[in-house]
Amino acid sequence: MKNSILILFLCLCSLSFAQQKVNYKVHAHNDYAQEFPFWEAYIGGASSIEVDVFLKENTLFVTHSENEINKANTLEKLYLQPLKQLQTEGRLRSLQLLIDIKSDAETTLVAITKAIEKQNLDEVEALHFVISGNRPEAKAYSEYPDFIQFDHQNLEDLDNIDLSKVALVSVNYKNYSVWNGFGNMVAPELEKVEEAIAKAHAVNKPFRFWASPDTKIAWTRFANLGVDFINSDKPAEAVSYLKTLDQNTYVNTQQIEVYQPEFKFDYNDTPVNVILMIGDGTGLAQITSGQIANGGQLTVTQLKDFGLSKTAATDDLVTDSAAGATAMATGTKTHNRAIGVDPDDQSLQNITELLGGK
């Protein structure tokens, strides 16, 4: 009995593990440029949020450059205070705040450290403060408090620096590929991209590209390549898409046998039987997807004569399966929810009855 329970437990654990989804992480690039800085990305589910800061007159302004400073937009107001509010209310989730320094590295970093400590956020386990942009040299990373980590941007010195203060490794995507996020990356560039990711993973550090394509195809490719933080200016959309990526992806593990018609008939003979198959929601996209998943072949694609039919219901532009099938089976349009009847709900002959002389 105990053995049976143990086996059942192991089977359930294995099943649970197999069903676990990969937690793809999205980095909200240039979050300060959004209509609602911080909140839009946070509510949207971003795992990492980027904020550019410039130190001027002892104030940390949220801006890309000094000449774009808006005195109402400070690091404390737009980011640190909301984080403190969430922490006080017990609603704070794990988050990486990547602070991209645009002014002098050392003086700005001192101001950032003091600002975080002022809000008592320096010992909050859920928060990870990561310094990017203008940073001190890697050899000076250890001089800063434990709650300050760094976004290292060099793949060539990972074996020579103290990695304990490195939160992630980020590099410019354009140094490795010119792919625009549509179609496929060319093989030589794909190899460079894979090598870059592998270097960071070899030292057990998360990896991010900046200046990377921001399309659904790109998000999918980067997720499959193992990019740990997927860069996006549309974080909520990217999170929503990636959250269902695995369940919306199908991999056919066993090809279905395809029927090969022999076409042994006399074209002058009268057909004896007519087989009318009406697919529900079966268009070119579905046929193409099935064909790709089945190694390029389907039974339906073996037919010599192949056509497409498009119809719309009499009462709506969007046609349901009942009205669509009736139109194709009888040659007469009808309203949605109608099967085998005309718009006045009168019975119709279908094509097999017409051809059979009934």
Give short role names for the model-derived ranges:
Residues M1-V22:
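Bacterial Sec-dependent N-terminal signal peptides
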Residues K2-S4, F17, D122-A126, K358:
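Short secondary-structure capping/junction motifs at helix and strand boundaries
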